[in-house]
Amino acid sequence: MKTGIIIPCYNEEKRLNTEAFVKFNKENRDYLLCFVNDGSKDKTLEVLYSMKEQAPNAISIVDVKKNSGKATAVRAGARFLYSKS
């Protein structure tokens, strides 16, 4: 069983360190990173899908179309992870 880490993202295109997340996944196989795009208006979602291509079994993406705040994004990630358990 993997431990899920929920990472809410809003307009994080320039701040997402793709290499660091992929490296973390390679070194820590017992974790699932669940990125929640919270209605970003930049290319955050594209960056997340690019990351997922490099680690498809260790990264999940939840796309919330309308920005609703961090708490809502975290709840969406928790619901997603719960549905996968």
How would you describe each model-predicted region?
Residues T3-E12:
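A conserved hydrophobic helix/loop-capping motif in glycosyltransferases and polysaccharide synthases
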Residues N11-K26:
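Short, well-formed alpha-helical segments that are part of the catalytic scaffolds
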Residues N25-N28, E53-A58:
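Short helix-capping segments at alpha-helix termini
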Residues N37-E46:
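A conserved acidic beta->alpha catalytic loop
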Residues Q54, T72-S85:
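Active-site nucleotide-sugar/metal-binding loop of Leloir-type enzymes
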